[in-house]
Regions:
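Acidic/glycine-enriched connector segments
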Residues: 1-233
Length: 234
């Protein structure tokens, strides 16, 4: 578990996480989501929204920022969507976290617990994550409880802090440090394929690649129309 501290704002709820190899079988990842993290309870999400890109050079203000957030919130709440990002606390991913935080609500989880209804999953590159030493479990047989400062900003040439509005993280370790490798992208591609397969426990998948703020100007209309299409198809 990750307890995010020193936040300007945030859910105040810890995030579950696991560190795994870039070669991990997708059936194991699916079991983790379904059986351990209960991503499909109380009902299976109708849609998975994958928002990738816009990490380092993204900036948006004013009405376009609000259009993006409202479009994402409409899709997330109407379809109980699972949202997937790269988990960074910057750029478009931070904006996604802000949007989900505003739309987030609690649902019962057993007789005496509540949990967050909207699932925001970060698939983060372990070798490019800031302060990974705080996330290493030194007692393998004991549930790790890490404290993470999510207000950190990325400096030039630095690694990436993670966003505290995410509910879960998959940290993909390909053995490399401080650089992007194709192995991470391959893991994300396999994850997308897993979501798109015909298994009844896997929802429909909607992929959006953000290159700059121009792409996001049409996001609200785009996500809304696609949500209607998927719902009608059911």
């Amino acid at each position: 578990m990750i307890d995010f501290i020193n936040e300007d704002k945030g859910s105040g709820k810890p995030a579950r996480y696991v560190r795994l190899s870039d070669q991990s079988p997708m059936d194991r990842v699916k079991d983790l989501l379904k059986d351990h993290w209960h991503f499909f309870k109380p009902t299976k999400p109708q849609l998975a929204i994958l928002i990738i890109g816009g990490g380092t050079s993204f900036h948006m203000e004013g009405k376009y920022r609000e259009l993006f957030k409202s479009g994402l919130n409409i899709a997330a709440r109407s379809t109980k969507a699972m949202i997937v990002t790269t988990g960074q606390n910057m750029g478009a991913v931070k904006l996604v976290g802000d949007a989900v935080s505003e739309a987030q609500y609690l649902v019962p989880d057993g007789p005496s617990h509540l949990r967050r209804a909207l699932k925001l999953l970060g698939i983060a590159n372990w070798g490019l994550t800031k302060n990974i030493e705080d996330l290493i479990n030194i007692k393998p047989n004991v549930l790790n409880r890490s404290h993470y400062y999510s207000n950190m900003e990325k400096r030039t040439g630095d690694v990436f802090p993670i966003n505290g509005d995410h509910t879960n993280f998959l940290f993909v370790d390909d053995g490399h440090r401080n650089k992007w490798e194709q192995s991470y992208n391959n893991f994300v591609s396999r994850f997308i394929s897993m979501l798109r397969d015909k298994d009844p426990h896997v929802m429909k998948c909607l992929f959006y690649n953000i290159c700059d703020s121009t792409n996001l100007k049409c996001f609200r209309e785009w996500i809304y129309l696609w949500s209607l299409f998927y719902l009608k198809e059911d």
